[in-house]
Design a protein with these regions (language model features):
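Catalytic His-Asp segment of secreted/periplasmic serine-dependent ester chemistry enzymes
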Residues: 183-276
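Intrinsically disordered, low-complexity regulatory regions of nuclear DNA-binding proteins
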Residues: 48-49
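Extracytoplasmic/secreted envelope proteins and their assembly/folding machinery
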Residues: 121, 125, 158-165, 200, ...
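Conserved SGNH/GDSL esterase-like catalytic core that processes O-acyl groups on lipids
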Residues: 1-45, 54-159, 242
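Conserved N-terminal glycine/acidic-rich loop preference
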Residues: 133-145, 154-161, 169-170, 178-217
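Extracellular low-complexity Ser/Thr/Asn/Gly-rich intrinsically disordered segments
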Residues: 176-178, 244
Length: 276
């Protein structure tokens, strides 16, 4: 999910660089999500060409895996059309991987997206199955509820969220899911958004049904109208929907703190079960 690249040129080059970070995690393989079927382009890899070990194509789902003999942290990827017929190239995303232990983190989504956006994406379920998650956090709903009170149907939101949960669990039935309640916000900068509380109700209902945890950002902020207080303290932007950089960092820190505490609680519960 996110932005798709579409091009009909005969020669396309994409450069990968760590320009704005001192941390440059290396990778030993890359997965390129693209058009389904036979890919009408040959791949070249610039200075990394000699390091290519093998290339594998999945025509059914639409991706290509490229494996390198050594770790690299930059790449010049070139697509050259291998047919006279003018066929376009569509790129849906890239995955950079290595064999190091730890967590592989993937973020999906774009500004303005709601649950309906993901459900309308015909490639989402297939691509998720190709790389099934072990842990999936749902942090979506602000745009779903960013409508007048009488135009928001909590049951439609609940059904859409449950459909998404089922897609994730179909990809990996053992996947752990974290549901999050959207943050407090204002509608058109001046109207209190009373839909968030209604979202929270159905999110908690699903959490109880599927035995999954919930992180209540709405409650954490102070509930209805609290985004005004966060804005006054430099934590939200003037639209009182999006956070500032400082606000997003605080939100991330609070999520990690809650997550670590939750893991500790689960560990204690497991130990008590063993004693019994």
């Amino acid at each position: 999910m996110g932005a798709a690249l579409s091009c009909r040129d005969s020669l396309i080059t994409i450069y990968f660089r760590h320009d704005k970070s001192n941390v440059k995690p290396p990778f030993s393989s890359i997965r390129i999500y693209h058009n389904k079927g036979e890919l009408p382009f040959d791949l070249q890899f610039g200075e990394a060409e000699l390091l290519v070990n093998r290339v594998e194509h999945n025509l059914e789902i639409g991706y290509t895996d490229v494996y390198f003999t050594d770790l690299i942290d930059t790449l010049d990827l070139q697509f050259s059309r291998n047919t006279k017929e003018v066929l376009g190239l569509e790129i849906y995303g890239f995955q950079f991987m290595n064999s190091d232990p730890g967590i592989s983190y993937t973020s999906i989504g774009i500004n303005g997206a709601g649950l309906y956006t993901y459900l309308a994406n015909e490639n989402f379920e297939e691509q998720l199955t190709a790389y099934p998650p072990d842990f999936f956090t749902f942090s979506v709903g602000t745009n779903d509820a960013n409508v007048p009170f009488d135009r928001f149907d909590p049951q439609v939101y609940k059904r859409n969220l449950e459909k998404m949960m089922k897609i994730v669990l179909k990809a990996n039935p053992k996947c752990a899911i974290l549901l999050t309640v959207p943050n407090d916000s204002y509608y058109h900068r001046k109207y209190l958004n009373r839909n968030i509380a209604r979202q929270r109700e159905v999110i908690i209902e699903l959490a109880e049904e599927y035995q999954q945890p919930v992180w209540d950002v709405y409650g954490l902020m102070g509930e209805l109208g609290s985004s005004k207080l966060w804005f006054n303290n430099g934590l939200m932007q003037s639209d009182m929907v999006h956070f500032t950089s400082v606000g997003y960092h605080l939100k991330g820190d609070l999520l990690i703190d809650a997550f670590v505490k939750y893991l500790g609680q689960m560990k204690q519960i497991d130990e008590l079960k063993k004693i019994k």
